Amino acid sequence: MAKELRFGDDARLQMLAGVNALADAVQVTMGPRGRNVVLEKSYGAPTVTKDGVSVAKEIEFEHRFMNMGAQMVKEVASKTSDTAGDGTTTATVLARSILVEGHKAVAAGMNPMDLKRGIDKAVLAVTKKLQAMSKPCKDSKAIAQVGTISANSDEAIGAIIAEAMEKVGKEGVITVEDGNGLENELSVVEGMQFDRGYISPYFINNQQNMSCELEHPFILLVDKKVSSIREMLSVLEGVAKSGRPLLIIAEDVEGEALATLVVNNMRGIVKVCAVKAPGFGDRRKAMLQDIAILTKGQVISEEIGKSLEGATLEDLGSAKRIVVTKENTTIIDGEGKATEINARITQIRAQMEETTSDYDREKLQERVAKLAGGVAVIKVGAATEVEMKEKKARVEDALHATRAAVEEGIVAGGGVALIRAQKALDSLKGDNDDQNMGINILRRAIESPMRQIVTNAGYEASVVVNKVAEHKDNYGFNAATGEYGDMVEMGILDPTKVTRMALQNAASVASLMLTTECMVADLPKKEEGVGAGDMGGMGGMGGMGGMM
């Protein structure tokens, strides 16, 4: 296919036009007084959002070179969202600012490579300053404030996330689901829960809840299908003598074995319930081992030379209580040793560091949470489906931001941290004038998030930025109320990781654009018009009258 080429300033100007158009659409959502953006959908109602990355993802231009610029900045927003969970609008505003200032310098004849080196040096200095300014985010109040800011000043969302983190710990899994009412709800599952229910409804012993509840049971873990009852006789006899109930977790329980267990259960000889093991393949083996460590049991597996016939009561795990429903099994208060459980968690975390797959990382994180004890579910309430989607996206954003805050700490919000980090550039010098220009480009660019927040709130950006720059520490401007003061005391906080990732990603992509000298795109296809003469063949249809 034939290609179209653009070089030098022409290429950069086209790219800049795309970046400006995208940034104009995204930046209106920034800050507490940011506006909504309405996105058309191919079917159903349009989506209303204040989430920068949602807006960016929807934008595409017909003009190929403009589109290439927009797609590169879209990558900044997506990358920041993936790694930090928030800060997408900040990253977009920073990228545009660096590119606009940098383009002026390149047009004035400066060396783009030296400008890039200067920008990179400045980013490194500002990042170090941000990390030095960062304070740990320990208490629920700070977590709630971070969540509130990230959810566009919705205090209810900040409070429910802080409550969820308090209940399941900072490593616990918090999931977001659609609620049924108008209010947000929080439910917490204590202990380990996995998504497998009873194999037969005849195991139910609580008719009211349609569940099987076992108090202080033994737990038999088997890494294969169980179809013959003979294999299990010695274990069943031991359990029956002890008078305690039994939970069997196996790949499957079928045929004669299942029938015998059901009959024994119904006659009250031994109180028993059987469920399928969670997961598939290697993940199933790993999860069985997790349950074994949690309950102080052994997985009966022929791979390690243990047969079901030779199993004894010493091989069985135990827990305080187990609840099995049609869909889920919950193990509460397993009797495993804390040291062994912590060692297992450390081992899974090491695997999380090594894996390159997001799916695998998510599954490993779930396993950590189940071992650490707890899964919280936030059910988002709203009046309409459109509001539900928008609110759910904000809750997920706020959740990511609070995780980032717990991980790397917090800095003053509202763009104040970046203004304070400018001081790190005062003593920074490049190897030549062009590098110094690169440092100055970043110095000006890191004011842009505050300028945009202030502009969206309807105030004069230059006046506010100058006043904030004259003061020290956390002194800043609260765009929601129009007041100056200590940002931390006012509860306006940003996760350090979000601010850092937004700056690094924005500078990385903007520097690449500045050093672009050629752009290549497909030539648009020429539509071949259909000639009117082609319709002539239809004259023969006149003869169809005879068909009547």
From Swiss-Prot:
Alphabetical keyword list: ATP-binding, Chaperone, Cytoplasm, Isomerase, Nucleotide-binding, Stress response
EC number: 5.6.1.7
Pfam families listed in its UniProt record: Cpn60_TCP1
A GO-annotated cellular component: host cell endosome membrane
GO function term, MF aspect, one: ATP-dependent protein folding chaperone
Top-level taxon of origin: Bacteria
Subunit annotation: Forms a cylinder of 14 subunits composed of two heptameric rings stacked back-to-back. Interacts with the co-chaperonin GroES.
Family membership: Belongs to the chaperonin (HSP60) family.
Name this polypeptide is given: Chaperonin GroEL
Natural source organism: Legionella pneumophila subsp. pneumophila (strain Philadelphia 1 / ATCC 33152 / DSM 7513)
